[in-house]
Amino acid sequence: MILIIYLTKIMGDEMTSMDMFFFLFIFLLFIYPEMMMRYRIMKRLRCIREIERQRGTRVIAMIHRQEALTFLGIPIYKFITIEDSEEILRAIRLTPEDMPIDLIIHTPGGLALASEQIALALKEHKAKTTVIIPHYAMSGGSLIALAADEIIMDKNAVMGPVDPQIGQYPAASILEAYYRKGEKVSDETLILVDISKKAIKQMEEFVYELLKDKYGDEKAKEIAKKLTSGTWTHDYPLTVSKLKELGIEVNTNVPRKVYELLELYPQPMGAKPSVYYIPVPYSKKESEKNAK
């Protein structure tokens, strides 16, 4: 409405309903989404700053969520990319060596190279590093988490295995199929087998290097083997209890502000919610009242 009044003042009587419709269409298609995105970014940075003040750390957030960049609600799918690793490495370089780093992760995974770069940079930082997982950090996200001095997860959050994927297939499954079928396979399959062997060996060694200082040689080798050898499917949820069973130390005290930050990454506007609830915390008295 404000836009229509503004345009009417500018254009005067010469403005037709078609002109108004055109300007409104341009506004909704390009200008409004950009304005909302800038507003959300400002709120995110403010929330990050509050977490930094509370914890005395440099906070870096890598949150991959579907976001709609137009009023049509077209979702943009996100995962760990080289651009992410460039930005995180830059943020770490801008952080004093004696300042702790909190890396907040919410991701399905992504490129192995980018994840490895982030993991190495995190491990090499001299002050304490913490990875905070409010919901999930699968695949490459799990690899990054293993590099931190401390992992903080929501009690219902999950990580995942870091076994290599060759194209659309797990490297461990390619090897399993080869061992069952024997030598009577195509040249292409033999090439995939060779790549799979190398990929598993490389990832196992990489995870071991991340863990050995924290857990010691024997335990680090055991955890690395378990996470990279295809023990589970790639999307298998490693819960807090499962991680502790593997010997990985996990803290479940996620700062409340981290959840508030995650809420500033809304799902696409065009998507109809399938979950409904009253979005306020209930007190114990309210619980007792409802029970009656």
From Swiss-Prot:
Transmembrane segment boundaries: 17-37
Protein name (Swiss-Prot/TrEMBL): Uncharacterized protein MJ1495
Primary localization class, coarse: membrane
Domain of life: Archaea
Topology with respect to the bilayer: Single-pass membrane protein
Pfam families according to UniProt: SDH_protease (PF01972)
This protein's UniProt keywords: Membrane, Transmembrane, Transmembrane helix
Localization: Membrane
GO cellular component, one term: membrane
Listed PANTHER family: PERIPLASMIC SERINE PROTEASE (PTHR35984:SF1)
Organism name: Methanocaldococcus jannaschii (strain ATCC 43067 / DSM 2661 / JAL-1 / JCM 10045 / NBRC 100440)
Alphabetical list of InterPro entries matching this protein: ClpP/crotonase-like_dom_sf (IPR029045), Pept_S49_ser-pept_pro (IPR002825)
Entry similarity comment: To M.jannaschii MJ0137.
